[in-house]
């Protein structure tokens, strides 16, 4: 059995490195689209809750079970479920909610792996989308940079990678301290605080020049840690939970799945630009609205491997999905549990 702490540590490293890409210039470029994406994702979160509650009532299920099958397991994912399931079970005095909700979240993760990237391929072919950032890490430019350097490339690249890992350790240590001292009672994931610390560190470095963050080394490490996380999290999936789900719960899930796909295809894509970046954000948004943000990033990565990198699309999904939505979704769930 894989240690869940190892999975969480790898994911924290990956997200901290993604946040280190967040230079002020890149943040300014994606600010408006990030706010739009955040607003639309919140609308989808409310829609998921209403669908779960309505369907649960129609099928004779407990209304809080409907909420668990909606926003908590879909947009919230396993991290949010871990925080809120004990409260729901205590509130309603019923057991089995945790197993059902985790089963729905697991089924969502599996389905998101199957539908997100194919939807992206469909949009690319239908609208002949081109990636404007394809030359962002141009090989010819990299070769010229290597030729001009007076040190062997492997030596320079290794040193830069070690520097980035050290910066990540410092950011994670600071985030742990902040979480313990000031945010102990706040139900937000640890990685959210890590990402905020990394964003501050990157822009502090750009402003003061005290240290640098090498883009190529950062890209190399993010790819390595994303692959590691996908491998570990896939091996850790408890697929047996899916087979324990009752027919009404599966019916509610597939209703949620259809709504999520339609929302990503027609709302995210059409309102966020109808371009390559908009397609990437729609793919990431669909995947993280079905159980786990990392699924969205892995589906985006599979498309970027084929069509070229797009850093601002990745950064928008990371900042919105893992920082802004982690906070606003917690508040939304608390509000929904209060009124229903």
Predicted feature descriptions by range:
Residues 1-8, 96-104, 180-191, 213-219, ...:
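Interfacial loop-to-helix junctions that mark the boundaries of transmembrane helices
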Residues 4-13, 22-54, 165, 220, ...:
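Entry/N-cap segments of selected transmembrane alpha helices
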Residues 14-20, 47-52, 108-120, 164-177, ...:
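Hydrophobic core segments of alpha-helical transmembrane domains in multi-pass membrane transport
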Residues 39-50, 71-80, 199, 219-234, ...:
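Small-residue-rich segments of transmembrane alpha-helices in multi-pass membrane proteins
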Residues 54-61, 105-148, 263-276, 321-340:
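Juxtamembrane and boundary regions of transmembrane helices in multi-pass small-molecule transporters
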Residues 55, 59-100, 107, 119, ...:
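Alpha-helical membrane segments and immediately flanking helix-loop junctions
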Residues 109-117, 121-207:
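Membrane-embedded hairpin module used as a gating/binding unit in multi-pass transport
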Residues 167-268:
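Transmembrane helical segments that form the transport core of multi-pass membrane transport proteins
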């Amino acid at each position: 059995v894989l240690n869940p702490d190892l999975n969480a540590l790898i994911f924290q490293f990956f997200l901290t490195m993604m946040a280190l890409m967040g230079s002020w210039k890149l943040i300014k470029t994606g600010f408006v689209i990030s706010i739009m994406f955040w607003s639309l994702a919140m609308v989808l979160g409310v829609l998921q809750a209403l669908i779960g509650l309505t369907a649960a009532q129609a099928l004779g299920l407990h209304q809080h079970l409907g909420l668990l099958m909606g926003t908590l397991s879909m947009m919230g994912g396993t991290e949010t479920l871990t925080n809120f399931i004990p409260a729901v079970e205590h509130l309603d005095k019923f057991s089995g909610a945790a197993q059902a909700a985790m089963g729905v979240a697991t089924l969502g993760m599996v389905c998101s792996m199957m539908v997100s990237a194919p939807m992206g391929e469909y949009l690319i072919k239908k609208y002949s989308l081109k990636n404007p950032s394809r030359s962002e890490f141009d090989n010819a430019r990299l070769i010229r940079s290597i030729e001009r350097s007076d040190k062997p490339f492997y030596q320079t690249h290794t040193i830069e990678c070690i520097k980035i890992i050290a910066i990540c350790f410092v950011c994670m240590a600071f985030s742990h301290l902040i979480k313990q001292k000031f945010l102990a009672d706040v139900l937000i994931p640890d990685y959210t605080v890590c990402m905020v610390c990394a964003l501050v560190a990157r822009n502090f470095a750009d402003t003061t020049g005290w240290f640098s963050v090498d883009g190529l080394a950062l890209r190399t490490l993010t790819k390595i840690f994303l692959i590691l996380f996908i491998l570990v999290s896939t091996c850790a999936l408890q697929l047996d939970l899916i087979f324990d789900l009752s027919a009404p719960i599966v019916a509610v899930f597939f209703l949620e799945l259809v709504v999520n796909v339609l929302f990503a295809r027609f709302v995210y894509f059409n309102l966020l630009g109808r371009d390559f970046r908009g397609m990437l954000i729609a793919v990431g948004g669909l995947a993280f609205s079905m159980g786990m943000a990392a699924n969205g990033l892995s589906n985006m990565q599979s498309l970027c491997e084929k069509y070229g990198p797009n850093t601002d699309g990745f950064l928008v999904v990371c900042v919105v999905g893992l920082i802004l939505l982690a906070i606003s979704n917690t508040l939304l769930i608390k509000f929904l549990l209060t009124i229903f």
